Amino acid sequence: MPRINALPDVPRWAALAAHAVPLVTLPSGLWRIALVAGLPVAAEPVRTVGESLYVLSLTVVSEALALLTLGLVQPWGETVPRWIPLLGGRNVPPLAAVIPALAGATALFGLWGWVGYVMAANLAAGSVTDTPAQLVLLLACYLPLLAWAPLLTVSAIAYYRRRTPANGMLTFMS
């Protein structure tokens, strides 16, 4: 069984969930990079520099946010790395990690609900793909994103349970 890099008290399932998050976001990012590179992955190519910057920024930001999930199972999620000015070496208050993680998961659940509604109600203008091969590639790259919200949720809950005192009392500053 492969070794997953995580703190010793992190349950294996939580470490696997946290490590899976950057992997489930990667295919969609690669699809967007292919789109910007001009590969025939969509019906319409990216036409302007502004569109290219937007698509690439979306890719970088989504992957960076996905990588932050690793903080829920790594030492830097409990103690701020020393190289960070002013905060280095301080303990991370558990709720300072859990609240943004659960807010992000909630936003992702909402986003997928909205996308599902738009698709089911046929509200989207035009089609993203021209050919069946493009559609299969698009689905293969974007369907893994459906796992992001549940994986982030269970990772955040495991982090909270691990960092919460036995009496269950936890404040934002603890």
Residues of each region from the PLM?
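Hydrophobic cores of alpha-helical transmembrane segments in multi-pass inner/ER membrane proteins
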Residues: 60-69, 143-156
